[in-house]
């Protein structure tokens, strides 16, 4: 839609505006599009903080809810994330809440402010076992788990980023858990409030992210 037409105007609204407008706690946007070639035209945008900017969005894969000009600098062509894995989904019979002799393979299910929550599988096939990774829940980046040895699997609610060493894992963990990066992720939270794991398929590397956000 954006690439094939000229988006003249875009307004982004948060849940507070949703309550005022629709009596419903939902985010919403509205926009004005002209059926013509984009030709690198600039779009007037009012973000959900009521900031007004004018910029070319034709090459943007995602439009954050706010601070768009800054966050535009973070997007790149590095695929930092493993594809989402559903092998050990929490609803499957091969997964249990209780660890025992049969269900002995640890599965990370969530990372809350209070700590990690684990499930247990009766097998360690797929599920990103044997992959070096840093892991966190899709409901919020808290208490990231570094699994360089690949001993832990993941449920459907875990995002796993690629790492090459424990040192790199710790560096990425510090960036992920920094408030500035969390603000970026929150600005990219849309309909269901879950973190969109695909964002990590199109970012700059973490050294560049750290520099841009001044972490």
Give the positions of each predicted feature.
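Signature of N6-adenine DNA methyltransferases within the class I
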Residues: 1-95
């Amino acid at each position: 839609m954006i690439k094939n037409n000229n988006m003249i105007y875009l307004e982004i609204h948060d849940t507070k505006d949703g309550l005022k407008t629709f009596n419903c706690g939902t985010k919403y946007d509205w926009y004005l599009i002209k059926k013509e070639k984009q030709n690198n035209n600039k779009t007037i945008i009012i973000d959900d903080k009521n900031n007004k900017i004018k910029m070319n969005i034709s090459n943007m894969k995602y439009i954050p809810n706010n601070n768009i000009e800054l966050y535009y600098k973070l997007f790149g062509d590095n695929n930092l994330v493993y594809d989402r894995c559903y092998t050990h989904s929490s609803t499957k019979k091969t997964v249990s809440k209780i660890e025992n002799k049969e269900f002995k393979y640890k599965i990370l299910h969530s990372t809350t402010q209070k700590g990690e929550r684990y499930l247990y599988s009766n097998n360690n096939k797929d599920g990103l076992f044997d992959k070096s990774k840093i892991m966190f829940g899709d409901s919020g980046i808290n208490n990231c788990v570094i699994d360089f040895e690949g001993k832990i699997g993941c449920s459907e609610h875990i995002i796993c980023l690629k790492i090459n060493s424990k040192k790199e894992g710790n560096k990425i963990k510090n960036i992920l858990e920094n408030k500035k990066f969390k603000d970026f992720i929150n600005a990219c939270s849309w309909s269901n409030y879950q973190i969109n794991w695909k964002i990590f398929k199109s970012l700059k590397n973490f050294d560049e992210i750290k520099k841009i956000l001044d972490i």
